[in-house]
């Protein structure tokens, strides 16, 4: 799946809130009206490496210039909806996991879904091995598209 960035500010996410919020309130995306997604470039295309189902929203797992992050889907438009079903996996979080209930489920490459600590290693701890696996899988996916 490929997406194009339309927005990179928390203020833009206000359109998708369930109720009106003042600018300094944290909304369902974990962002205020002042939040900036500096890792995103408006108009740029991104290859989606996974979908993260947070408690109150969904996010794409993407990278920009080597910086891996999860960003709310509402910041993008889908430009290629094809998903590699042969190599993508799905996992529902167990309530005993540290990331539950904040993350409910993950859809993505094998290691992301089958290692219970993969999300933490990749996004929170930024472990080198987890990042290497991410980019290895990205290269494989780019060859298929």
Where are the regions that the model predicts?
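N-terminal acidic leader/helix
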Residues: 82-89
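Short aromatic-glycine-enriched beta-strand elements
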Residues: 55-61
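Secondary-structure transition/turn motif
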Residues: 8-9, 62-66
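SH3-family beta-barrel domains
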Residues: 1-32, 89-144
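A short macromolecule-binding patch
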Residues: 67-78
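Conserved beta-strand/loop element in small beta-rich adapter and peptidoglycan-binding domains
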Residues: 39-50
């Amino acid at each position: 799946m490929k997406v194009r960035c339309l927005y990179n500010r928390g203020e833009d996410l206000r359109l998708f809130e369930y109720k009106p919020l003042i600018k300094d309130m944290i909304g369902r995306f974990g962002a205020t009206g002042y939040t900036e997604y500096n890792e995103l470039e408006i108009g740029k295309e991104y290859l989606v490496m996974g979908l993260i189902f947070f408690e109150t929203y969904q996010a794409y797992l993407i990278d920009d210039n080597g910086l891996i992050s999860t960003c709310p889907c509402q910041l993008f438009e889908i430009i290629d909806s094809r998903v590699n079903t042969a190599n993508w996996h799905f996992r529902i979080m167990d309530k005993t996991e540290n990331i539950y209930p904040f993350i409910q489920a993950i859809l993505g490459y094998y290691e992301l879904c089958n290692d219970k600590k993969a999300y933490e290693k990749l996004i929170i701890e930024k472990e080198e091995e987890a990042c290497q696996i991410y980019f290895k899988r990205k290269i494989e996916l780019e060859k298929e598209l």
